[in-house]
Amino acid sequence: MKINVVDHPLIKHKLTLMRKKDTGPKEFRELLKEITLLIAYEATRHIETFETEIETPLEKTKGHFINDKDVVIIPILRAGLGMSDGILQLLPNASVGHIGIYRDPKTLEAVEYYAKFPKITDNSIVFVLDPMLATGVSSIKALEIVKKNGAKNIILVTLIASPEGTEKVNIEHPDVIIYTASLDKKLNSKGYILPGLGDAGDRLFRTK
C-alpha cells in the first residue's frame, strides 16, 4: 500500500485544531494551508534536482535546483482549492489545473462537472489535492481524468484518509503515491470519515 502518513508534532497540533467543531472558517482556512505546506515538504521528495554552478561571495561552487516548471498542481474543487496556496508557497513556478467533481449524496458516485489542465508531459510530476479521502470515489475519478490527460507520475495529497478510501485508490491506481496527515478510523453510513472533521468544503467556504 503506497500511503505515507506524515507524522509530525506540528501537523498533529494543527490537525487537532481543524477537527474541533468550534474552529471558525478563517482559522480553518489558515490551518489547511499550513498543514498542506507541511505535508508537501515530504511529498516533494520525489522531485528531481539538477546540478548547476553558482558563485557565492567567496568562490564558485556547485549547487542543486529543482525544476518546478515540470510540476503540475491539480486541486479537486471545491475543497482542494484550500490546499493550493500551501503547496504553491513551496513551488511558486508550478502550473495549476482544476478538476470539478462532486459526490452525489444519494448514490455516493463521483460526478465530473469541470476540468481544465495545463500542459502535462511524461516528465511532469502531478500533485492532486483533495483534503478528505473518504469513499475514494472522487479521488479515483480525478486520477482517472488526470491520467487520460497524460499524467504518469502522480502524487495524491490529502489531509485525512479513511482505510476504505485508501484501499480503493490503491486497487484502482496502484501506481499513485498517497501522502496524508492522518489515516482515520472508518467511514460512517453516510460516507463521512470518523472521527474526521466534517465536510471540509462546507467548513472552508461556510456554506452550511
Curated annotation (Swiss-Prot):
InterPro entries: PRibTrfase_dom, PRTase-like, Upp_B, UPRTase/APRTase, Ura_phspho_trans. Pathway: Pyrimidine metabolism; UMP biosynthesis via salvage pathway; UMP from uracil: step 1/1. GO terms for biological process: UMP salvage; uracil salvage. Its cofactor is Mg(2+). Pfam families: UPRTase (PF14681). One of its GO terms (molecular function) is uracil phosphoribosyltransferase activity. 5-phospho-alpha-D-ribose 1-diphosphate binds at residues 78, 103, 130-138, 199. Allosterically activated by GTP. Gene3D superfamilies: 3.40.50.2020. Its EC number is 2.4.2.9. Keywords: Allosteric enzyme, Glycosyltransferase, GTP-binding, Magnesium, Nucleotide-binding, Transferase. SUPFAM superfamilies: PRTase-like (SSF53271). Uracil binds at residues 193, 198-200. It catalyses: UMP + diphosphate = 5-phospho-alpha-D-ribose 1-diphosphate + uracil. The keyword Secreted does not apply. It is an enzyme of class 2 (transferase). Binds 1 Mg(2+) ion per subunit. The magnesium is bound as Mg-PRPP. It comes from the Bacteria. Belongs to the UPRTase family. Catalyzes the conversion of uracil and 5-phospho-alpha-D-ribose 1-diphosphate (PRPP) to UMP and diphosphate. This is Uracil phosphoribosyltransferase. It comes from Thermosipho melanesiensis (strain DSM 12029 / CIP 104789 / BI429).
